[in-house]
UniProtKB/Swiss-Prot annotation:
This is ATP phosphoribosyltransferase regulatory subunit. One of its GO terms (biological process) is histidyl-tRNA aminoacylation. GO terms for cellular component: cytoplasm. This function is generally fulfilled by the C-terminal part of HisG, which is missing in some bacteria such as this one. It holds the Pfam family tRNA-synt_His. It comes from Bacillus mycoides (strain KBAB4) (Bacillus weihenstephanensis).
Length: 420
């Protein structure tokens, strides 16, 4: 039963050394930015009851969840989403409203094989609870733009869409749930030919304003001109209000000087059914992968308690790291300046010397070897030019000059030795 002991499960991988450090740095910079903007931290368990995700419309496919049983036979899942557990917390432990929260953690979804998607990813995000007006969406977009700027991510854009517009259109069409899922796929993928065929097959009236808007929806992406085009075809007040909200958000963010970071895509339709209004997606041009996703979900928290308006977005940390690795100089570990070799009875003195050298800006580290020659070999291999030996009665500094030679030798006190 040891066939797989040397392998990783499908869709997972190990993160080593520099890449692991970069993931941590990205998480911490995002965290600091969000905390500076007044968000408070929340952490939820990595495991949740299956029932947390099994409500009406089932926003996450059951097949995508990692499921197992607890000691009482209840179904447990590895969290496939961060927003739903946060909605559970807010709905069951309501605090002061409005509330701005931030989080970071791993999310697990079983993707199909050979899709190139990982089943375990790191997400950092923000949620604003209790605000209905556009200030919530604007705050979310500004927060993520500033966070990406501080990470020095280049060439990114945040697309603003409106799922409410799509839902208004679908309500007027004589189609069932399965056909709606198909329609959503065509629009999201901007498959113009398939959408046109769908309209013909369902015998939808192309002279009707709603059908004309539906057919144009995948093409309505860019700047404010697409909003004006959509407004001309909007056949209800609900549609017009949905479009006007996108326009107001775009214009406000543009006035702040962030116009180059945003665009509009009215054909963007999120696959998660809990979104009810404005939605977001962020991309980096070079990698073409989604780095930000989110939107308004005014009905989600009601599944766990009182109905409350909410907006949020998640940053895909792994994709940010991938982009930074491609856009910037490779991350390099800080070079070790001095290795300190010590006898066990001199560990305290060696540690004091290391601390003194660190305060002087030198990266000094204790050797893990018991033999001085092994320390010399390690230093040579890692291009460390100085080794200090903490012997029983003295401290000896060696430097590399085609061979290891004694630079100085002195008192047992690390302070006196360092000053010489």
């Amino acid at each position: 039963m040891t066939k797989w002991k040397r392998a990783n499960p499908n869709g997972t991988r190990d993160y080593l050394f520099e890449e692991c450090t970069l993931i941590e740095e990205v998480e911490q910079k995002l965290r600091r930015t969000f905390l500076e903007r007044g968000y408070e931290e929340i952490r939820t368990p990595t495991i949740e009851f299956y029932d947390v995700f099994a409500f009406q419309n089932r926003p996450i496919d059951e097949e995508k969840m990692y499921k197992f049983f607890d000691e009482k036979g209840r179904i447990i899942v590895l969290r496939p989403d961060m927003t739903i557990p946060l909605a559970r917390v807010i709905g069951t432990q309501r605090g002061d409203i409005p509330l701005k929260v931030t989080y970071s953690g791993n999310v697990f979804r079983a993707n199909e094989s050979l899709t190139g998607k990982y089943n375990e990813i790191v997400q950092s995000g923000i949620e604003i609870i209790g605000i209905e007006n556009v200030r919530a969406e604007i705050e979310c977009v500004i927060s993520v733009i500033q966070a990406l700027q501080k990470l020095k991510v280049q060439s990114f854009t945040i697309e603003i869409g409106q799922v409410q517009l799509y839902k208004c259109i679908v309500k007027k069409l004589p189609i069932n749930d399965e056909e709606e899922k198909l329609l959503r796929t065509y629009i999201e993928s901007k498959n113009y030919a398939a959408l046109s065929h769908f309209i013909e097959e369902k015998k939808l009236n192309r002279c009707d304003e709603t059908v004309r808007l539906l057919e144009k929806l995948p093409r309505l992406f860019g700047s404010l001109d697409v909003v004006e085009e959509a407004e001309k075809l909007a056949s209800s007040n609900e549609m017009k209000m949905a479009i006007a909200r996108v326009k107001e958000i775009y214009e406000t963010i543009e006035q702040l000087g962030y116009g180059s970071y945003i665009s509009i895509d009215l054909g963007m339709v999120q696959h998660l059914d809990y979104y009810t209004g404005v939605i977001f997606k962020g991309y980096i041009y070079e990698i073409g992968e989604e780095i930000v996703s989110g939107g308004r979900y005014d009905e989600l928290i009601g599944n766990f308690g009182e109905m409350m308006p909410a907006v949020g977005l998640a940053v895909q940390v792994n994709q940010i790291v991938k982009a930074l690795q491609e856009q910037q100089e490779p991350y390099k570990r800080k070079r070790i300046d001095i290795m300190i070799h010590y006898e066990l009875n001199r560990l305290a003195e060696a540690e004091r010397l290391r601390n003194l050298l660190q305060k002087d800006g030198k990266n000094a580290q204790l050797s893990l070897f018991s033999n001085l020659n092994d320390t010399f070999q390690f230093a040579n291999k890692n291009k460390i030019m100085t080794v200090v030996e903490a012997k029983s009665e003295s401290l000896v500094e060696y430097v590399w000059r085609e061979k290891w030679i004694i630079q100085k030798e002195g008192e047992a006190s690390c302070v006196t030795f360092k000053l010489r």
